[in-house]
Amino acid sequence: MLTGCLSPDPVKFENKIREWVPLGTAAADAQRIMEHHGFECHFITTSNIFNSSGFDYLDCDREQVRFHDWSARFIFQDGKVSEYGRIKTN
């Protein structure tokens, strides 16, 4: 697993996410890439009763004790990343 250092700076983190998973990336590839970078990901489909958004999305989170937490959401259309949801650091 490539964990590396992620920036606590929100702009730098968002740029890194967009570099790792560009628009048009297949859902399975997006999940594989993010998990490779130490994130835990959950794919939520429109058939999930807790999904009120109307689209499939992938939520990825990475937590580190006494440091920062990172999270990113990828929104899918036709099985590919069509836009980015929230991307944040805590």
Tell where the protein language model's regions lie, with residue ranges.
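Electropositive phosphate-/nucleotide-binding environments in soluble metabolic enzymes
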Residues: 11
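Post-signal peptide N-terminal segment of mature Sec-exported envelope proteins
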Residues: 14-35
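A cross-family detector of function-defining hotspots
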Residues: 31-75, 89
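C-terminal motif of bacterial Sec signal peptides marking the signal peptidase cleavage site
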Residues: 2-4
